[in-house]
Amino acid sequence: MPSPRLPSVPRVHALRDFEPLARKRLPRQLYSYIHNGADDERSLAGNRSAFDDYSLVPRMLTGVSGRSQAIELFGQTYASPFGISPVGLGAMYAYRGDLVLTGQARAAGIPAVLSGSSLIPMETVAQAAPGTWFQAYMPGDPA
């Protein structure tokens, strides 16, 4: 009996490579929500512009045996200097998406932040992925 063929994995080499894949897979409203910025998208444009100032510089023919991406943040050691940012309504993109994201972040040893607009209760996420941060929206000062 022949083994079932696995679906082909698209080649993703950079973050921008995810965009056309997401556009094909997600319903238009969900893609628009996650792809676009708020209001006139000035913050989105500013963030992209700021990251354009950075690049990775390969260093050829150097020793790599002692390298580590590990960092310490707030007394906790993480495997890499990046993590999973809060994704509003994460469960709309994948079944129990918030649990998937936070669980994978925990397995990879990187921080994850649960959105304040998560559809999964934070207690459920905290039990499944201890150490997950929470994006809290505090009420403003009425004075």
Residue ranges of model-derived segments:
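Glycine-rich phosphate/pyrophosphate-binding beta-alpha loops
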Residues: 86-92
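Conserved, mostly hydrophobic/aromatic
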Residues: 27, 84, 105
